[in-house]
From Swiss-Prot:
SUPFAM superfamilies, per the entry: PAZ domain, Ribonuclease H-like
PANTHER family named among the record's database cross-references: EUKARYOTIC TRANSLATION INITIATION FACTOR 2C (PTHR22891)
Residues annotated as domain Piwi: 746-1067
Protein name as it appears in the record: Protein argonaute 1B
Length: 1118
C-alpha cells in the first residue's frame, strides 16, 4: 500500500470485528423495521411464509412468483395485520398504489390513494400476486389515525417484555429480502452524449412493452411525477450540458465563529500567458531527463533566443511563458552528459554525451480573463487550462529542490528521517495546489509524509528486509521471492569503480548463486565466472558468493551485478503496500496536534518564499503568507432516542460523544442460539467460556434479548483448519436446532492477535457459505475484558442481528426536513481499489441503502467486483436476456429499492445518494453514468416512477484543514485541540458558485481532524444549505459501531466497510478447500446460459461469491 499520510491516519479503515447474521425463523427474525406500537424492537418470533425467492429480475415491484397469504407481524404489545391474504381481491396483484393508472383494463378493486397510483399505459397490471410484504397493511395498535406519509408512527416506549411473548405459529413479518444481482455479461452504457431518452435506455424491462419503456425514458423530463410536485430533470446527455447545482444561499443555522484554513490567497496575475508545444527527440519517458534538457536550453538561450523570458515547463509536452517568445517555431539542439554513467567525472572516466533535438512551437494563448470571470461567479465553468498554468508555474521551483510525488514534494531536509523498518524510511514534505475559491485564487498547503527506500548498500537493505544476518544461512525460496518483490524496479548505483557511479534499474534476481554464474566475455566464446571477472577487471574480491546477483537490463542481454557492489540511489519513493508495523511507525511520525501542524504549514510557506520565487515573479503571482480566516458555524448535536425501559430515555451528545450508561438500545435484537469457536491457543476453554458469558450479560444489560449459554460448549480449533472447524461446528449446532425449527443466530470467534488471513477466511465462509453473522474478538481483549470493549462489541452484535442501537429523536417526531415528510431512502456508495502493485485485482463496489423510514438507521448492503481501478459502479443497473423471461432487469439500486418497499410497505418518494471515493476530475463522468443507472432502476420498477434524486459526493482525501482561531480558547476547541464537532464552512474557501461545504462532524482523537467535503452534483429535492448540512451532521451521530459522531456520513462509511469486507471474499486460486467453485462461478440465481464472469475492458472479472440472503439483509459489515 503506497501509504501517504497527511493527518496522522491511513486512508482506509480497518474492519475490527464480525458477527453472525441473525436468520429469520422460529424465535428470531431480529429485524424490527416499523415497530408495532408498544414493541421495543424485538422482532417477531416466527417467519411468515414466502413465495420462492426471486433473483435478479422480476416484474416491477412485484416478484416473479407470488407469495402466499398476508402474514402478521407480532411485536411486543401490538401487531400489524397484513391485508390481502387468501381472500384479498387485487386481481392486478400487488398493492393498489403500484397499479398503473388510467389505461383501459387497469381496474383497482382494492382502491388506494391516487397519489400512489402509477401511470402506465394500457393494461399495465402486474399479474402474479405478491408476498405479504407487498400488500398494504392495516396498522393496528395503540393510537389514533395513521400518521402522514402512510407509515405507522413507531412506538419506542412501554415496559420491556410487556406481552407478545407467545406468538402464534406463522405470525411473523418477513425480514426484507435482498437478492444479490446475478453476475452476467453486461455492456455498461457508455458515458457519452446520449440523453436519458430513447438513445440511452438499455433494453426494456420485461414488465412493460418496449414501446412503453422508450416513451417513458423520452418523457422523464417532462412528465409530472406522481409522488412529488417537482418535475424531474432529464439526465444530462453529456458533460457539456451538465451544470452542477448552484449554491442555494449560505447556511445560517448554528453558532457563528471564525476558523483558520490552510489556504493562502493568491493574487491573480495580469500577464499575457502563452502556451507552446514541446517535442524532444529522441523521446524519453523520464520527466527528469526532459526537465534537464529544458533547464540546459533556458540556461544557454534565455537571453539570446527566448527574449529574456523564463518559461515554466510541465516536464512533458507543454511550455508556458508570460508574454510571447520572439518566434512561432524554433528548433534547438541540446547536449547533456549522461548522469546514468558517472557522477564524479574522476580520472579516466569520461561521461557519455547525449544529443537532443528540441522543437518549441506556439500553440495557444491562455486567457486569464475567463478565470477572473469564473472567480467572480459570472462564468459557470472553471477554465482548467489557466489554473493548470498557474499550478505549473508554482511547482517549477520546488520540483528542482525536492522529490515530487503527485502534487506533493518531499525531502530528507524538510524534517528528520524516521526509520520505518525493513529498509524503508519516512520523508517529510508538503502538498501544494492552486484552487479557485470564493475568496479568489487560493494556494492550499498541507504537511505530508510518505515512505522512501533507504539509500543503503543492497546487502544491508536485504538484511533489514529479512531481519537477519544473511551470511549465516542460505536464502530460502520465500526469502528470494520477498527480495525480488522489494527490489524490482529499484535504481542502484555501482560502488566498485571509484568515481564511476553508473546507475541501473533492477529487473530481477539470478536463480543461481554468484559463484555459479559465468558469461562469455568475447566473440571467441571465452567464458569467465562473475567472481573471476570482478577480481581480474576491477581487483574486487566478492565475499558473498552464495547470494544471487541482481539482474539489470533485459532478458536478451542480462547484466549481472553482485549485491555487495550496489547501493540504492537516494530519493526513491516506496509505492508498494506497507505492513502493519510500517504503517504504525509512519502514523507516529505524521500525527501532529493542530497547533503544531498549523505552525509547520506557516513555516513551509515562509521557507518556500514565494515572493522570491523567480518563476512566480516572472508570471506576476503573489502569495499571501497568512492563513485564511473563514466564517464558520457550529451546528448543535441532535438528540438521540434510547429505549424507554432504560433510566435515560434519550441523550444530547456533548462534544461529539456520549455513552451507554443507564441506556438501553432502542430496538434490542434477539440472540437465542449462539456458539463460540476459539482459534487462539493462548485462551483456555474456561477463559473463552468466561469471556462469552460476560459478553452475553453486557448484551442483555444493553437491551438485547440474549441467551446466557451457548447451544454448544466453546470449541477450540487451529487457524489452519478454519473451514473444517466452522462447517463442523455449524453442522453440530444445526443438528440440535433444526428439529426444533430454530436457527443459529450468532457465532462468537476468538482470534489470535496476529491472525494473518484467518479473519478474512472466516468472514468469507460465514457470510457467503454458511449464512452466519459472526463477531470476532482478539485474544488481548479476551484477557482484558474491559466493560467499554464489551459495550462496543454489543453495539456491533445488535445491528448484525437486525436491531437498532439508537435513532434520531427528530426522525421519530417527523422533524427532519425533506426526509420526514415522505418515504425517503438514503444510499451510500463507494468503490475500493486494490493496492498499488496488485495489477490485476478487481475493484470492489459497495452500495448500502436505508431500510427503515422514518428512522433511516438500518442499512442493507450489496457488493460487486468490477474491472481493476474502474471508478464507475458497473452493477447499479443491469439488463440481460433470459431465455424464458425475455429481457430482465436487475442491479444493486433495484434490489435495494425493492427491499425498502418490503421493509416499510412503501416505495421511496425521495432518493438521497451519498457517493464516496470520487475525485474532482471524475465528477461529471460519475454523475452522468450513475444518475442514469438510478433513473433506469426506478423506471424498471414501475412506468414513470422517478422519485427526485439528490446526488452528493463525499470527499475525505483532500488537504483542507481547519484550525481554531485561538488555540487557547477552550470554548472553541475539543480535548485534542481540534475545532468542535459540527463545525461547518460554506464560504470563502468553498467553490465560487457551486453547492459544497466542509463539515467537521467528529471530535478529534489524535492528530488534526480532517473535515469531510460534501459537493452536491445533482439536486431535484431542492435542499437549502441549512437542510443538507444539518441532515448530514445529524446522520453522523447514528453510526452503529460507537457512541461518537463520525467523520463522514454513515451510509458512505458503511459502503466503505462493506467494500473492504468484500475484498476478503476473493479467495486465492487455491485454498484449504481446494477450489473456488463454491460460490463464485456458480452464482445463485444466475439465469441459465448466462456466464458468471462479466467482461470489462477485455478482462473477465471474476464475480464475488454471493452473500447469503439472511446476511445481506442486516449490517453484516459492521
Amino acid at each position: 500500500m503506497a501509504l501517504q499520510l497527511e493527518n496522522g491516519r491511513p486512508h482506509h479503515h480497518q474492519v475490527p470485528i464480525m458477527v453472525k447474521k441473525k436468520r429469520t425463523g422460529s424465535g428470531s427474525t431480529g429485524e424490527s423495521s416499523g415497530e408495532a406500537p408498544g414493541a421495543p424492537g424485538h422482532g417477531s418470533s416466527q417467519r411468515a411464509e414466502r413465495g420462492p425467492q426471486q433473483h435478479g429480475g422480476g416484474r416491477g415491484w412485484v416478484p416473479q412468483h407470488g407469495g402466499r397469504g398476508g402474514g402478521q407481524y407480532q411485536g411486543r404489545g401490538g401487531h400489524y395485520q397484513g391485508r390481502g391474504g387468501q381472500g384479498s381481491h387485487h386481481p392486478g396483484g400487488g398493492p393498489p398504489e403500484y397499479q398503473g393508472r388510467g389505461g383501459p383494463g387497469s381496474h383497482h378493486p382494492g382502491g388506494g390513494p391516487p397519489d400512489y397510483q402509477g401511470r402506465g399505459g394500457s393494461g399495465s397490471h402486474h399479474p402474479g400476486g405478491g408476498p405479504p410484504e407487498y400488500q398494504p397493511r392495516d396498522y393496528q395498535g395503540r393510537g389514533g389515525p395513521r400518521p402522514r406519509g402512510g407509515m405507522p408512527q413507531p412506538y419506542y416506549g412501554g415496559p420491556r417484555g410487556s406481552g407478545g411473548r407467545s406468538v402464534p405459529s406463522g405470525s411473523s413479518r418477513t425480514v426484507p429480502e435482498l437478492h444479490q444481482a446475478p453476475h452476467v455479461q453486461y455492456q455498461a452504457p457508455m458515458v457519452s452524449p446520449t440523453p436519458s431518452g430513447a438513445g440511452s435506455s438499455s433494453q426494456p424491462a420485461a414488465e412493460v412493452s418496449s414501446g412503453q419503456v422508450q416513451q417513458q425514458f423520452q418523457q422523464l423530463a417532462t412528465r409530472d411525477q406522481s409522488s412529488t410536485s417537482q418535475a424531474i430533470q432529464i439526465a444530462p446527455p453529456s458533460s457539456k450540458s451538465v451544470r452542477f447545482p448552484l449554491r442555494p444561499g449560505k447556511g445560517t443555522y448554528g453558532d457563528r465563529c471564525i476558523v483558520k484554513a490552510n489556504h493562502f490567497f493568491a493574487e491573480l496575475p495580469d500577464k499575457d500567458l502563452h502556451q507552446y508545444d514541446v517535442s524532444i527527440t529522441p523521446e524519453v519517458t523520464s520527466r527528469g531527463v526532459n526537465r534537464a534538457v529544458m533547464f540546459e536550453l533556458v540556461t544557454l538561450y534565455r537571453y539570446s533566443h527566448l527574449g529574456g523570458r523564463l518559461p515554466a515547463y510541465d516536464g512533458r509536452k507543454s511550455l508556458y511563458t508570460a508574454g510571447p517568445l520572439p518566434f512561432a517555431s524554433r528548433t534547438f539542439e541540446i547536449t547533456l552528459q549522461d548522469e546514468e554513467d558517472s557522477l564524479g567525472g574522476g580520472q579516466g572516466t569520461q561521461r557519455r554525451e547525449r544529443l537532443f533535438r528540441v522543437v518549441i512551437k506556439f500553440a495557444a494563448r491562455a486567457d486569464l480573463h475567463h478565470l477572473a470571470m469564473f472567480l467572480a461567479g459570472r462564468q459557470a465553468d472553471a477554465p482548467q487550462e489557466a489554473l493548470q498554468v498557474l499550478d505549473i508555474v508554482l511547482r517549477e521551483l520546488p520540483t528542482t529542490r525536492y522529490s515530487p510525488v503527485g502534487r506533493s514534494f518531499y525531502s530528507p531536509n524538510l524534517g528528520r528521517r524516521q526509520q520505518l523498518g525493513e529498509g524503508l524510511e519516512s520523508w517529510r514534505g508538503f502538498y501544494q495546489s492552486i484552487r479557485p475559491t470564493q475568496m479568489g485564487l487560493s494556494l492550499n498547503i498541507d504537511m505530508s509524509s510518505t515512505a522512501f527506500i533507504e539509500p543503503l548498500p543492497v546487502i544491508d537493505f536485504v538484511a533489514q528486509l529479512l531481519n537477519r544476518d544473511i551470511s549465516v544461512r542460505p536464502l530460502s525460496d520465500s526469502d528470494r521471492v520477498k527480495i525480488k518483490k522489494a527490489l524490482r524496479g529499484v535504481k542502484v548505483e555501482v560502488t566498485h569503480r571509484g568515481n564511476m557511479r553508473r546507475k541501473y534499474r533492477i529487473s530481477g534476481l539470478t536463480s543461481q548463486a554468484t559463484r555459479e554464474l559465468s558469461f562469455p566475455v568475447d566473440d571467441r566464446g571465452t567464458v569467465k565466472t562473475v567472481v573471476q571477472y570482478f577480481l581480474e577487471t576491477y581487483g574486487f574480491s566478492i565475499q558473498h558468493t552464495t547470494l544471487p546477483c541482481l539482474q539489470v537490463g533485459n532478458q536478451q542481454r542480462p547484466n549481472y551485478l553482485p549485491m555487495e557492489v550496489c547501493k540504492i540511489v537516494e530519493g526513491q519513493r516506496y509505492s508498494k503496500r506497507l505492513n502493519e508495523k510500517q504503517i504504525t511507525a509512519l502514523l507516529k511520525v505524521t500525527c501532529q496536534r493542530p497547533q503544531e501542524r498549523e505552525l509547520d504549514i506557516l513555516r513551509t510557506v515562509s521557507h518556500n518564499a514565494y515572493h522570491e520565487d523567480q518563476y512566480a515573479q516572472e508570471f506576476g503571482i503573489k502569495i499571501d503568507e497568512r492563513l485564511a480566516s473563514v466564517e464558520a458555524r457550529v451546528l448543535p448535536p441532535p438528540r438521540l432516542k434510547y429505549h424507554d425501559s432504560g433510566r435515560e430515555k434519550d441523550v444530547l451528545p456533548r462534544v461529539g460523544q456520549w455513552n451507554m450508561m443507564n441506556k438501553k438500545m432502542v430496538n434490542g435484537g434477539r440472540v437465542n442460539n449462539w456458539a463460540c469457536i476459539n482459534f487462539s491457543r493462548n485462551v483456555q476453554d474456561s477463559a473463552a467460556r468466561g469471556f462469552c458469558h460476560e459478553l452475553a450479560i453486557m448484551c442483555q444489560i444493553s437491551g438485547m434479548d440474549f441467551a446466557l449459554e451457548p447451544v454448544l460448549p466453546p470449541l477450540t480449533a487451529r487457524p489452519e483448519h478454519v473451514e473444517r472447524a466452522l462447517k463442523a461446528r455449524y453442522q453440530d449446532a444445526m443438528n440440535m436446532l433444526r428439529p426444533q425449527g430454530r436457527e443459529l443466530d450468532l457465532l462468537i470467534v476468538i482470534l489470535p492477535d496476529n491472525n494473518g488471513s484467518l479473519y478474512g477466511d472466516l468472514k468469507r465462509i460465514c457470510e457467503t457459505d454458511l449464512g452466519l453473522v459472526s463477531q470476532c474478538c482478539l485474544t488481548k481483549h479476551v484477557f482484558k475484558m474491559s466493560k467499554q470493549y464489551l459495550a462496543n462489541v454489543a453495539l456491533k452484535i445488535n445491528v448484525k442481528v437486525g436491531g437498532r442501537n439508537t435513532v434520531l429523536v427528530d426522525a421519530l417526531t417527523r422533524r427532519i426536513p425533506l426526509v420526514s415528510d415522505r418515504p425517503t431512502i438514503i444510499f451510500g456508495a463507494d468503490v475500493t481499489h486494490p493496492h498499488p502493485g496488485e495489477d490485476s485485482s478487481p475493484s470492489i463496489a459497495a452500495v448500502v441503502a436505508s431500510q427503515d423510514w422514518p428512522e433511516v438507521t438500518k442499512y442493507a448492503g450489496l457488493v460487486s467486483a468490477q474491472a481493476h481501478r474502474q471508478e464507475l459502479i458497473q452493477d447499479l443497473f443491469k439488463v440481460w436476456q433470459d431465455p424464458h423471461r425475455g429481457t430482465v432487469t436487475g442491479g444493486m439500486i433495484k434490489e435495494l429499492l425493492i427491499s425498502f418497499k418490503r421493509a416499510t410497505g412503501q416505495k421511496p418518494q425521495r432518493i438521497i445518494f451519498y457517493r464516496d471515493g470520487v475525485s474532482e476530475g471524475q465528477f461529471y463522468q460519475v454523475l452522468l453514468y450513475e444518475l442514469d443507472a438510478i433513473r433506469k432502476a426506478c423506471a424498471s420498477l414501475e412506468p414513470n416512477y422517478q422519485p427526485p434524486v439528490t446526488f452528493v459526493v463525499v470527499q475525505k482525501r483532500h488537504h483542507t484543514r481547519l484550525f481554531a482561531n485561538n488555540h487557547n480558547d477552550q470554548r472553541t476547541v475539543d480535548r485534542s485541540g481540534n475545532i468542535l464537532p459540527g463545525t461547518v464552512v460554506d464560504s470563502k474557501i468553498c467553490h465560487p458558485t457551486e453547492f459544497d461545504f466542509y463539515l467537521c462532524s467528529h471530535a478529534g482523537i489524535q492528530g488534526t481532524s480532517r473535515p469531510a467535503h460534501y459537493h452536491v452534483l445533482w439536486d431535484e429535492n431542492k435542499f437549502t444549505a441549512d437542510e443538507l448540512q444539518t441532515l448530514t451532521n445529524n446522520l453522523c451521530y447514528t453510526y452503529a459501531r460507537c457512541t461518537r459522531s463520525v467523520s463522514i456520513v454513515p451510509p458512505a462509511y458503511y459502503a466503505h466497510l462493506a467494500a473492504f469486507r468484500a475484498r476478503f471474499y476473493m479467495e486465492p486460486e487455491t485454498s484449504d478447500s481446494g477450489s473456488m467453485a463454491s460460490g463464485a462461478a456458480t452464482s445463485r440465481g444466475l439465469p441459465p446460459g448466462v456466464r458468471s464472469a462479466r467482461v470489462a475492458g477485455n478482462v473477465a472479472v471474476r464475480p464475488l461469491p454471493a452473500l447469503k440472503e439472511n446476511v445481506k439483509r442486516v449490517m453484516f459489515y459492521c
